[in-house]
């Protein structure tokens, strides 16, 4: 009888081999898992990259499509026949207006159905088709680019808190400028006309322009700033045209404030015999300004601020009530006002303890607000020159001596000067 084969290995050895086989299989499975995970991550990365490329290409396609549409519209406009430019004289009914076309004359024309009749008023610039003379487009007002530049786009950051020693002036300008713009019903209830213009006059450096900037900051309206010298032009009639367009722009962007600095350059008193064509042109500009201030169409949404340091040479026709309703004087600050101004300009400075600003204010008798600000700046420059990060009393004293230009001997010590 044949012997049956028996496994002669020990049970421990068989179990070890079985465990080794299972461990090898587990390692192989773990390796395959890591391989496929890396492969999945790589595919996901490629998918994200392809998605980003697709989004970028779609954005480029949309941009190119928009450019194509814009160019097609521009090409269509270029292929259209030209139009006549006219000015509306009178609205006649629901679909007809009387238009003046220079130099041909006046015509009664039809209005295109796409035009809103409520937007058409006298003096509106319009476009007429050259074949049928149908009004098909309302044009914006023609304003000189130089006049457009006078409109201040960014609201000034000056506030009333930055102005010292002018409490009475601030109160008066609020009554004339801010109150009519923010609460016009108060004037209507009293039955009085709103003030049109304000004249700020006083020595240079007393805060006239600074207060005008603060008014623009606190009133939510368009601020137009123009210097009187900008309205003096070389050719006859140019200055008058700029004044007209200035008020046209103010009416379009109402409520608005027109600030005319150095008004004495065009508003000086008229003489019987001028010295030349230059004076005559300046007088024409002033006459146009007077006409605009009177205004055949009085607007309560336009306020005029004027500033000058030579009120004595201004024409009396400009100063009469109805054109300039309030005149606000800006004198040099007194001792208390000088102290307030010094506190305002030095509150951001790194000062040493014990600085006596009241003593500085006492020594600057007759100084203007601009000179007080210059003293604070010069004191900081003296500290900077000594490589210090703080300002001392001596820095202020030297700054006062420099700004005020004391008539003293050069070798005189500062201690003797301030005794």
Curated annotation (Swiss-Prot):
Keyword Ubl conjugation appears in the UniProt entry: yes
Gene Ontology CC: nucleus; plastid; proteasome complex
Keywords of the record: Acetylation, ATP-binding, Cytoplasm, Isopeptide bond, Nucleotide-binding, Nucleus, Proteasome, Ubl conjugation
N-acetylalanine PTM positions: 2
Glycyl lysine isopeptide (Lys-Gly) (interchain with G-Cter in ubiquitin) cross-link, chain position(s): 406
UniProt: ATP binding residues: 202-209
Subcellular location: Cytoplasm; Nucleus
TM helices/strands, residue ranges: none
GO molecular function: ATP binding; ATP hydrolysis activity
Listed InterPro entries: 26S_Proteasome_ATPase, AAA+_ATPase, AAA_lid_3, ATPase_AAA_core, ATPase_AAA_CS, NA-bd_OB-fold, P-loop_NTPase, Prot_ATP_ID_OB_2nd
Main location: cytoplasm
CDD domains: RecA-like_PAN_like
PANTHER family named among the record's database cross-references: 26S PROTEASOME REGULATORY SUBUNIT
Oligomer status and interactors: Component of the 19S regulatory particle (RP/PA700) base subcomplex of the 26S proteasome. The 26S proteasome is composed of a core protease (CP), known as the 20S proteasome, capped at one or both ends by the 19S regulatory particle (RP/PA700). The RP/PA700 complex is composed of at least 17 different subunits in two subcomplexes, the base and the lid, which form the portions proximal and distal to the 20S proteolytic core, respectively.
Function per UniProt: The 26S proteasome is involved in the ATP-dependent degradation of ubiquitinated proteins. The regulatory (or ATPase) complex confers ATP dependency and substrate specificity to the 26S complex.
Similarity field: Belongs to the AAA ATPase family.
Protein's recorded name: 26S proteasome regulatory subunit 8 homolog A
Source species taxonomy: Eukaryota, Viridiplantae, Streptophyta, Embryophyta, Tracheophyta
Gene field: RPT6A
């Amino acid at each position: 009888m044949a012997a049956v084969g028996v496994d002669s290995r020990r049970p421990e050895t068989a179990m070890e081999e079985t465990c080794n086989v299972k461990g090898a299989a587990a390692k192989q499975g773990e390796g395959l898992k890591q391989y496929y995970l890396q492969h999945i991550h790589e595919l996901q990365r490629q998918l994200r990259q392809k998605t980003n490329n697709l989004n970028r290409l779609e954005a480029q396609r949309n941009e190119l499509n928009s450019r194509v549409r814009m160019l097609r519209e521009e090409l269509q406009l270029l292929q259209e026949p030209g139009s006549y430019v006219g000015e509306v004289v009178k609205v006649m009914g629901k679909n007809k207006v009387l238009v003046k076309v220079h130099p041909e004359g006046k015509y009664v024309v039809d209005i295109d159905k796409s035009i809103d009749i409520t937007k058409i008023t006298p003096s509106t610039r319009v476009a007429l088709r050259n074949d049928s003379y149908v009004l098909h487009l309302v044009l914006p007002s023609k304003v000189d680019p130089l006049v457009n530049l006078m409109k201040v786009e960014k609201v000034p950051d000056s506030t009333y808190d930055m102005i010292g020693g002018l409490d009475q002036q601030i109160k008066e300008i609020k009554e004339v400028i801010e109150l009519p713009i923010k609460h016009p019903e108060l004037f209507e209830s009293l039955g009085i006309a709103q003030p049109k213009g304000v004249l700020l006059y006083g020595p240079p450096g007393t805060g006239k322009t600074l207060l005008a900037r603060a008014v623009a900051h606190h009133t939510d309206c368009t601020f137009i700033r123009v210097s009187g010298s900008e309205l003096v032009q070389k050719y006859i009639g140019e200055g008058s045209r700029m004044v007209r367009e200035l008020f046209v722009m103010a009416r379009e962007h109402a409520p608005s404030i027109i600030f005319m600095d150095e008004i004495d350059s065009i508003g000086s008193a008229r003489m019987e015999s001028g010295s030349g064509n230059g004076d005559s042109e300046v007088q024409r500009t002033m006459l146009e300004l007077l006409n605009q201030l009177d205004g055949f169409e009085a607007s309560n949404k336009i306020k005029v601020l004027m500033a000058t340091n030579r009120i004595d040479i201004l024409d009396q026709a400009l100063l009469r009530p109805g054109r300039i309703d309030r005149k606000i004087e800006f004198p040099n600050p007194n001792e208390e006002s000088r102290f307030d101004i010094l506190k305002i300009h030095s509150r951001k400075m790194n000062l040493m303890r014990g600085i006596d600003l009241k003593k500085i204010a006492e020594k600057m008798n007759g100084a203007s607000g601009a000179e007080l600000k210059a003293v604070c700046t010069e004191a900081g420059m003296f500290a900077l020159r000594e490589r210090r990060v703080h300002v001392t009393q001596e820095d202020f004293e030297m700054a006062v001596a420099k700004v005020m230009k004391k008539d003293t001997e050069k070798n005189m010590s500062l201690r003797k000067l301030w005794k």
